Amino acid sequence: KYEYVDYFVNFIKKRNAPKLKYLFIDEAQDLSAQQWKVVDMLQQESGALETWIAGDDDQAIFRWAGADIEHFISMANDENNTIKPLTQSYRIPVSVHTLATKIAQSISRRIPKEYKPRDEEGKRKVLNIRPLNQGLKEGDWLILCRTHEIVKQVSEALETYGWLYKRYGSSVISFRFIEAIRAWTKLQKGETISGVDCDVLYHHMDSTRIKRNYGVFKGQHESLYNLDTLIKEYGLREDIKLSSTRTASVKDIAWYDMLNGKGLRKRIPYLRSIMRSGNKLDAIPRIEVSTIHASKGGERDNVMLITDLSYGPYKASTENQQGRDDEARVFYVGATRAKKELHIIHRTEGQFEYEPIFFHERNCA
């Protein structure tokens, strides 16, 4: 059985490198010691005339996954290597750059570097609450959290307020749910739907809605069907028992009572919350929730940076310099996702927060 690292070990042993003219290594601050050995072997065996290594030690946030940050930093201090710093950011505005610079300069061992922000001033705010209702009414938002548990808390709040959002880059609503709701709504209006839509619809109803042996739609995908046809020929029950005291005609039942398939049933309160808030189920989400680590490489006009910490990161950030440096890098990455506005949120749930960011914010010119 092969582990991931075994591929590197065997590749290094065989020294069967492809012939290259140039060797490019990106995100080099995240490479592990074993991966650096692969780079060394490629440099020796590939015949590459030049090796270009790109990375930013201030964004080295994967030490916990094995990243050898010190190796990357030591390469910049090797006089045999030529350093070409990138001196212009095309993302962050002045106000975000000022804070990000303060955070980066608090890291004890780093490659000294300077870069300019965009000309736009931007905005930087510190808030004592998570403005997850009215504060998100306009614009694109990236809400960044230190841990998966905090992502979960924020997600629950967004669903209560009826916001359509993405989590870790993916919509939290299955498109098939939306297709089923549309299909049932059209049937109730007296319209026809395709066999493909019937298939989706039947998938989201159980035997209390569809007669036994009709659980899978057996019509033709290219044909059209109305509600009466589904009742007469395809097993849709005409009367539905909704509770011990209530039975209703299938023609009078709203989608949120009719569609009771296991996956959809759990999401109905959230789907109804979206609609009550005046939002459309099929709209493109303006809001995304993510951990800081998962957001690396991303950007958004507006970033809400939640500073709550779990005990583990908090303990590491207060016990030793390496822990302080690593946590500073994490929040540096979080802050620099913002293209226009950065909203820094004080601890609201747990016991701990990343306190240095507020010290740096107060000391920004």
What is each of the regions a protein language model found here?
Residues V126-G139:
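Conserved interdomain hinge at the start of the Helicase C-terminal
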Residues V94, C145-V330, A335-L342:
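Core RecA-like ATPase module of SF1/SF2 helicases and allied nucleic-acid translocases
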Residues Y22, Q29-E121, L142-A157, S170-F175, ...:
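Conserved helicase motor core of SF1/SF2 NTP-dependent helicases
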Residues K1-F24, D30-M41, R267-T291:
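Conserved helicase/translocase P-loop NTPase motor core
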Residues A17, E45, G135-E138, G297:
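Alpha-helix termination/capping residues and helix-transition junctions
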Residues R167, G235-L242, G350-A365:
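C-terminal/domain-terminus segments
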Residues E341-E353:
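Cysteine/selenocysteine-centered motifs that mediate thiol-based redox chemistry or coordinate metal-sulfur cofactors
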